């Protein structure tokens, strides 16, 4: 594998999310998020958002539909939006195979076509914070506008309190057969940006991408969400557990 990888062209790094969330992202999807973990996460979202059968629900940054389709199976009426045609194609195929009716839309979460349509919306598993602060706040305003009065918005993200303050990058490796996805993650403490330099070794070739996202603490989320039109903001830990400062996740649930 090494000899062939050296001969492959190394693309330039990119900060564009639609380059990062591509076929390689899809290929390693079930390794990073096994089906049993996705089942558990869908159950947690259902509970946190107080969903019932027939609830109209929007997922922003739905990817390949691993959560969207599961919630549709549970009886909610799902709409999924994503910027990646590759991931949406997989989401639609899986929905058809599972016999669920999901509306999948190619689009940008900073500009949504819906107003007062959904009972709930959510951004799950690091789908928030990929823009500058102004555009991140715009995403929250657009989400609020898409919700009916009393609607709920859920955001699942990294708990900024638990992010190591040292400068040395942290390495995460996912392996599928002989292929590897290697993430080197580092954090800019002063800006709150978390950078991911991703190395893909697949089919004997090497590809590199780069992306960063913004980490926010609970106080920042509360301020932005109230400014966007939400009346209350609650914090939870991973998959709806009690929030702790040293836990890995911060789950926000805001009510309009």
Task: Tell what function each PLM region has.
Residues 2-63:
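Conserved class I S-adenosyl-L-methionine
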Residues 66-111:
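Class I SAM-dependent methyltransferase SAM/SAH-binding core
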Residues 110-120:
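A short acidic, Gly/Pro-enriched loop at the edge of an enzyme's catalytic core
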Residues 122-124:
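A conserved beta-strand element that flanks and buttresses the S-adenosyl-L-methionine
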Residues 134, 154-224:
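SAM-dependent methyltransferase
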Residues 137-149:
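A short glycine-rich, Lys/Arg-flanked "PGG" loop and its adjoining helix->strand segment in the class I
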Residues 218-256:
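C-terminal lobe and adjacent flexible extensions of AdoMet/dcAdoMet transferase-like proteins
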């Amino acid at each position: 594998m090494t000899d062939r990888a050296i001969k492959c062209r190394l693309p330039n790094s990119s900060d564009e999310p639609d380059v990062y969330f591509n076929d390689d992202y899809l290929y390693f999807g079930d390794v990073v998020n096994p089906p049993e973990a996705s089942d558990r996460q869908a159950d947690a979202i259902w509970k946190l958002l107080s969903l019932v059968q027939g609830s109209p629900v929007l997922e922003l940054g739905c990817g390949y539909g691993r959560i969207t389709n599961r919630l549709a199976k549970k009886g909610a009426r799902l709409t999924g939006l994503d910027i990646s045609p590759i991931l949406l194609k997989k989401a639609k195929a899986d929905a058809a195979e599972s016999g669920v009716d999901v509306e999948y839309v190619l689009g940008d979460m900073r500009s949504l076509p819906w107003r007062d349509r959904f009972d709930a919306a959510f951004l799950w598993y690091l789908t928030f914070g990929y823009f500058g602060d102004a555009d991140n706040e715009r995403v929250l305003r657009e989400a609020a506008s898409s919700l009916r009065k009393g609607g709920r918005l859920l955001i699942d993200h990294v708990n900024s309190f638990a992010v190591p303050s040292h400068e040395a990058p942290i390495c995460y490796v996912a392996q599928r057969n002989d292929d590897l996805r290697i993430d080197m993650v580092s954090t800019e403490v002063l800006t709150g940006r978390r950078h991911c330099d991703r190395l893909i070794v697949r089919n004997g070739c090497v590809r590199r991408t780069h992306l960063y996202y913004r980490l926010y603490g609970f106080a920042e989320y509360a301020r932005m969400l109230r400014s966007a039109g939400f009346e209350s903001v609650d914090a939870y830990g991973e998959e709806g557990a009690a929030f702790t400062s040293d836990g890995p996740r911060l789950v926000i649930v805001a009510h309009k």
